[in-house]
C-alpha cells in the first residue's frame, strides 16, 4: 500500500465521517433513526451507490464492528445506574436467555420454510437475528423519557443477550460444518462458559481497572484513554477465553460508572465522543459491505420473516419471558415487545458464516441485513409514538442546561450546574437571600446578558439570568425545582394527578381528609408511602399508576428505593 493509497483512504474516511455528522440533523427532521442515516451514507458510498467503493473485506468489517461495539457498551455501562438493576436485572436476564431462545427458534423455523433451507440452517438465521442490539437500543432510547422499569429492562437485555446469540450462532455453524444434526450436552457447558466468563472477567476486570485509575497519577487527558484501553482489554481477553466479551465490557463499564472514580466528568465526556465515532464508523463500514442490489431477490421472503419476528416471535418471547414478573403491566409488556431493535450485532454475527465458508453464507448475511433495515425503519421510527400510546413516557427530571465536573475529590463528585431562568420559574424577581437552596450548594456566578454580576443577598433574579451553582448529583432534584426550564417533552400537565401528597403523611389522616374506604385490617398508622408500596407490590418506579377506591395513585418521586411523593387523580365521583 503506497502513500497515495493511504492518503486516499484518509480522505475518503474523513469525507464519510464528516458527511455522517453533518447529515445527522436530518434524523430528527425526517423522524428516522440516526443509525439509518449512517448506514445509508455507507451504502451510497458502496458498490451500488454513487461512490462506487468496492469493499468486501469481512475480517476488517468484523474487526471494526467489534471494536466499536466494545466502546459503545463500555460507555453504555458507565451511564447505567446500578439502581436500575433493582427493578430490571432478573426480567432482563430472562429476556436475554429464554427470550432469545424462543425468538431464535420461531424465527429459524419460519426462515427454513421461507428460504427452502434445512432446519439447522434456518435456525442459524434465527440465531443470527435473535438478539436485540445494544448500540441501537442505547442510541434510540436516549431522551425518550421512558419509565425506569422499561428503559432499564431494555438496556440491560440488550447488553446481556448477545452471549446467547453468539453461542447459538457458533454452535450451529460448527454443526453445519461437521454435518451434525443434533446437539450434545456440551451445548449447556459452552453456554455457561459464555455467561460465566463474561460476568467474572467483566466485574473483576472492571474492579482492577477502577483501582488502577484511582491509584495512579496521570495527566487528566490520559484517564479516559486508560479507561477505554482497559475496557477493550477486558473485551478481548474474555473473547479469547471463549467468554462473552460484549457482556464483560458492559459490566466493566458498570463498575466504573457506579463507584467513586477519578476524573469521572472527563472520562464520560471523552466516552461520549468515542461512542458517537464508534457508531458512525461501524454503520458506515456495514453500509459499505452491503450491496443493495443483492437484497431485491430476497426482499419478499425477508420482509415476511421480519414481520413474523417483529409481530409474533418477539412478542411471544417477551410475554413468556416476563411471566414470572407480575410488576410489568400489559402496556409495558406490549412496548417491550415492540422495541426488539436489531442493529449491528446481527450483521456482525452474519459475518461468521462468511468467514467459515459454509453453504448459503451470503444468503444469511443479506437476510440479516434486510431484517436490520426493517427493524430500524419500522420499530425505530415508531418508538416515540409507541411510547406515547402505551403511556410509558414520564415527565423528565428537571435538568440544568449544562454540567461541568470538578475533579476535586473522587469520593465527593462536585459539579458546576448551569441554569438559565425562564419566565415560568417562581424565583423570577426573588432576592437571592429568599431562595431555599439545598444544603451544601452555592451560587458561584450570575450572568445577566454578557455581564458577570457580583451578587449579594439583595440581588433579584430576572428572566434570562444564567446561574452557575456548585453542588452534587443528589442536589439536582431540588435545584431543578428552583431553576430548571420547563421540559420540552409534551405531556399532560397533570400527569401525576390533581394534587401531590407527601408520602410520609399518615394514612389515617389522608383517609379522613379524602374519605377513603380503607379495607378492614389495613394499618391506619402506616405512611402513605408504605400503603402505596403495599398496593403496587414488587419494585415501584416513578410513573407507576394504580386505581384504588375511585382514585388513580401515581408515584411522583422516589429517593433511592423509598417513595417520597404520591400523585392523586380523581377517576370517578365517589358515592
UniProtKB/Swiss-Prot annotation:
Organism: Yersinia enterocolitica serotype O:8 / biotype 1B (strain NCTC 13174 / 8081)
Family, similarity comment: Belongs to the monovalent cation:proton antiporter 1 (CPA1) transporter (TC 2.A.36) family. NhaP2 subfamily.
Keywords carried by this UniProt record: Antiport, Cell inner membrane, Cell membrane, Ion transport, Membrane, Potassium, Potassium transport, Transmembrane, Transmembrane helix, Transport
TM annotation in the entry: 3-23, 30-50, 58-78, 95-115, 122-142, 172-192, 194-214, 221-241, 270-290, 293-313, 334-354, 358-378
BP term (GO), one: cell volume homeostasis
Major localization listed first in the record, in broad terms: membrane
Domain RCK C-terminal: 403-485
NCBIfam families listed in its UniProt record: PRK05326.1-1, PRK05326.1-2, PRK05326.1-3
CC per GO annotation: plasma membrane
Role this protein plays: K(+)/H(+) antiporter that extrudes potassium in exchange for external protons and maintains the internal concentration of potassium under toxic levels.
Compartmental location: Cell inner membrane
Taxonomic lineage: Bacteria, Pseudomonadati, Pseudomonadota, Gammaproteobacteria, Enterobacterales
Gene giving rise to this polypeptide: nhaP2
Descriptive protein name: K(+)/H(+) antiporter NhaP2
SUPFAM superfamilies: FAD-binding/transporter-associated domain-like (SSF56176), TrkA C-terminal domain-like (SSF116726)
Catalytic reaction equation(s): K(+)(in) + H(+)(out) = K(+)(out) + H(+)(in)
